[in-house]
Amino acid sequence: MMRPSSRQPYVCWQCLSRKDSGQHIALNTRKARVASLSSLASWPISSASIAPRPTRQWDRTLRLFRERRQGLSTSTSLLGRKIPEISNEALEDFALPLEPDLQHLQDSQPKTTKRSAHLSIRQRLKQWEAENPEPFHSIPSDFALPDRPINAFTSKRSEHMLEIENIDNDNATAQVHDQDLIDTQVTPRVQAGDLVELKSEDWNIGVLAVCLGSFNGIDHFYAVTGKWFASSNFKSGFIVKNFITNSADLQPVIGALPSTVGDMSILVELQKLRAGPTREHGAGLITKMLDFQNTSRQIYQSNLERLSNPHRHLPEEEQLMTLGEIAEFLLPPKLKQSSTGFPPAALYAVYNNIRTFFDDFFHPLGQGTAGPSSIIFHVAARSDIENVARVERMVRDHYSPELLDRKSRREHDRLEPVLRQARLAIDHSRKMREWSSHGMLGPTTRVLPASTYSWSQDALTVIGVIHMWAASDVFPRSSKYQWIGAAVLRALGRYQDADVLDATVGWTFLQEIGWLMPWEIHARHSLRLPGLQVNRAGGLLPSPEEQQPAELDEDVLAPLRQDFYTSTVYCIDAPNAKEIDDGVSLEKTDKEGEYWIHVHIADPTSRIRPDSSLAKRAALMTQTSYLPGHVDKMISDEAVVAEFSLAPGRPSLTFSARLNEEGTLLDHKVTPGRIGDVVYITPQDVATAVGPVDAGIPKVSTPDVVLEVGTPPSAEDEAPTRKMTKPDELSEQNVKDLEILSRLAAAIHKVRIQKGSVPIFLPSPSADFSLVNARIEHTPSGFLACTNDPYISVKYSVSGGLHPIVDDLMGTANQIAALWCYERGIPIPFRTNLLAAQNEEALRAYTQDVIYPQLIAGKQPSLEEMRTLRNLLGGHDIAATPTFIYTMGVDIYTKATSPLRRYSDLLVHWQIQAALLEEHKRLAQGSQSLVIRKFDKYHLKPPMDDKQAARLGLPFTASHLENKVFPHLRVRERHAKTLANIDGRNELILQALVRAWRFGEGKEGQVPEKFTYTVVNVQNTCVRGRIDYFDLWAEIDLDNLAGFSLLSNMRAGDVLTVQLADVNVHMRKIVVKPVEFVQRGPERGRLFAEEQEGEGEVENGGEYIDVEHEVLQPQGR
């Protein structure tokens, strides 16, 4: 660095310092810095094969802590940075040789103010700071708070400033409530050697990194920038499997990890201190990543024209597209490899381009198991992009200084008429409902006639863009389009009471003008996928095909059907169920103690073809959505559902199991059939009729907490959909059948428990919703006038375990469907746990010692424990090659028992149907069946090849399923589950909470004044945890924490008494204010020491550390 001087233009500071001290100045020479190595002599080597770390890094670390203790700022690297606090105990465990009075620099200097004549400028500055101590004051960061827009234009961040978010918002990962085997995690499990892109969603920064493995449930990565990262909630949009194939290339970096503890807060502090492997340790990995990155950049530069304007070359309509499909439009075919399509470097060129420059209109939704080409995007319609540009121009013209005079504004300002229309609608709404900052309007206070305002086309365009911003969540936090909606709200002049004009205010604006219902659910819009249109009055809009009567083909299985008229079929379901797609019957054999159990499933695929409009609509829906108040059927045609719901004389596809009294599966078969007599009965009435059955299911109490607002519907409004049989109406034979079925189902359940099945599902909050007393009126302009308010009731319920007949016999049918297809090599959507086989012993130990005892005791395992379990399982997925499902205690599994409600079940039925027809033809000709192999869960083989599948007439080949069907199916199943079971349910709960807490609805005192709050983790800007009220997530932000405690003093495991400070329904967020500590969590240093001492011991979880990468586990820790 140079500085100006009065005697010469520029003078080096170091030369000037030496000149003033009388030193001889030599050109082009520097005095080398000498670092003392004695203070690092005690640093342990983690493995004999790993060289010592360079001293420079840890010398800097020691200097940071010395400066912290003295309250000094002696390092330019501290500017704008808050030094993380870390306890002495933890430092000792890190083996950092930090002595209490480390002041070697001051001790080496004279104790007088006289300065030595032999100091460099750096030494002189250090001495000056030592003689003039001042407390360190961090420069405030301009980082935005969570959920707030980010200034990503004038405040840029480089890839070297990347920080990985570790907030785990996936409630389904943290709790065990069901066995639907749908993984809500967007990112598949990564393993050591995989290449990933680490990303910051806030700043749109992406950095390539190699996964080092998972240790104590936390993933570790080494980035191309030479930095080490650890993450407990890793998310990536781009993964290349087996990028590093030789484990020896990873070992130097793994051996240099400073810690592999399971406490994320400690690892975060170490990352901030730049601890971890150096560039020398990771030189080999960096070289390989740079080669990959440079190849990708060369491909990008060679195809710059098409990549710079991707939407110009893609289809105009909104759709889901895989990265491989997008690359087909944007890259030349000559880049393709013969059998695998585009290479990963070419795919990364496309991915990195659209993620960096077009992330507003390309939203990655997850990656499958078929490599980067299976990454799937929600691609916006070209008309949406044009509307955003049009509204942006309108808003800019409205605020442009050259249009300030009235005449010009009247002629050119197209936004002002829209604002006048909106103000009238807002003022009319506020005469009936109070506006609130809680992401929803208040309840109805008076009823007025609906407004008849006429909305212009410009107004509809502006409203559409605000809908994209506030309802559909199209724009990321760092998007340049975030300002548009805020500018429109500011111009309205009606939201002065809002702290920030953000998307939440935009959401309430849409409610006030009648575009959305006051009780609308945000997740219905943010989770909507292409092909489905949300009906703003509730549910989904029907497609044009659905508005026409459905056409059904002839029954292709009619010649194969067998009659089951001699057996009574028991359809066990709720009285208000409309799709009756399963039932069971019993058949005795000629051997005592052995029975045939027949599970009869509705058979719509016999008359619905895979390429029909009904099938295509079912593929878009994926499954029936049971979101309260917005039930949307996969097959919406009532006539079709009635045609195939089980009833006397109806067709069925029957999955039969021969069982003994011990629950052992002796034989199985699949038969097209017709059912005879049917008894409809509820699970509760079955339990009443047969009495208690010992299925080994532990008893658990259900909390009696209830939150209720609105007027409940009358009993007449919930009439059953069919004649239900009561226990006293059952015949003697019916009771005997149900007793045997219950006994066999209980035996099956015990077998599954022995194989590792989850023993019990704990109660979870559920919401009931009724619009009986609310009124929705459509205005002539297509808007909504809503009066009164819906009824919402929140209470605890159990999603599984109602009766063994329901759960275990349906599970057996699914197992038979999977087994039957596997024996014939038929590709179907098998449900899989990718790592369960290789981690079986560790899974058994971990579940039996850690997870299941807590469930049996009525306690949900912690986030860290459930994350470790998921790492061992490898998550849930669908694939054409099966694995066994450990947590269900089954060796092979698919879903086949709800074809009227799930598209994956239709896929299974179509494949089985084609195989049955082919097998029937072969047997008629005297040939053998299609069975080609026996089942062995430890040596599972892939399905038949595509040519053989085509010869058999299968509608779907394995490659078609893996590359075309499964990527879409994964995303749509995940969104459907998230909407109905997580985000949508939580919004209904928060709506009821706001109406009771903020507006005083419902019974007095049903919302406590104070709650017990347990801290789960401490983030950079808040504390996150759960309150003891429906187990809801809540956070303590810095404003509410001020005056109570420093953020650095909060610990995971702290128990506090808190009060509600804010509830935001739109953001699904609760903020609480701490009142007092009830109990302190374990100190970080002591917790870390216990974990380090416990590694390798079964009782402390050491046996479960990095089981999936055992060969790569650091030694000697």
From Swiss-Prot:
Domain RNB: 561-916
The keyword Metal-binding is assigned to this record: no
Domain of life: Eukaryota
Cellular component terms (Gene Ontology): mitochondrion; P-body
Comp. bias regions, Basic and acidic residues: 719-730
Family: Belongs to the RNR ribonuclease family.
Record-linked PANTHER family: EXORIBONUCLEASE CYT-4, PUTATIVE (AFU_ORTHOLOGUE AFUA_7G01550)-RELATED (PTHR23355:SF65), RIBONUCLEASE (PTHR23355)
Protein name from the UniProt record: Mitochondrial protein cyt-4
Species, as recorded: Neurospora crassa (strain ATCC 24698 / 74-OR23-1A / CBS 708.71 / DSM 1257 / FGSC 987)
Lineage: Eukaryota, Fungi, Dikarya, Ascomycota, Pezizomycotina
